[in-house]
A protein has these predicted regions:
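N-terminal leader/targeting and pre-domain segments
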Residues: 1-139
């Protein structure tokens, strides 16, 4: 699996483009830690149109807990190794659309200024959360 590196990712995000991950019948990958860096340390380099990924495999755990992200986060037809964590985050927008294997979403205390969109995504996961002490939840 071909990996999207920081130089390529930042170049597309500065230009306000969409990171395309489809390659030769498979998906290119991006490390979750790099996406966190873009939302935290490198956020001043991201165009106001936001972080937009299409058909990308996000590898590792995407942990945006407690972050304030002033631009939209849009994942279209992306795959995730683990459930994204957005506990206590303040996001402008979060869109996880058409994701074929979304292992859940941990978002206790999440604040979204605009839209939270999970259209066409298949959520398959049971997660323990502090908000539900007697059951598991997918979201």
């Amino acid at each position: 699996m071909d990996e999207i590196d920081e130089t390529e990712l930042i170049g597309v995000l500065r230009a306000g483009g969409v990171v395309q991950g489809a390659a030769g019948g498979g998906l290119r990958s991006v490390p979750a830690e790099l996406l966190r860096r873009c939302c935290h340390q490198l956020r001043d380099q991201v165009d106001p149109r936001g972080l937009r990924l299409s058909q990308v495999a996000v590898t590792g755990g995407l942990d945006l807990a407690g972050l304030t992200v002033p631009f939209p986060l849009r994942f279209d037809e992306c795959e995730f190794d683990t459930a994204p964590v957005v506990d206590g985050a303040q996001l402008d927008e979060l869109s996880l659309t058409g994701c074929p294997r979304l292992p859940g979403l941990l978002g206790n205390g999440l604040r979204v200024r605009r839209d939270l969109d999970l259209s066409r995504s298949q959520v398959a996961g049971a997660l323990w959360t502090s908000a539900s002490t007697s059951r598991t939840a997918a979201i």
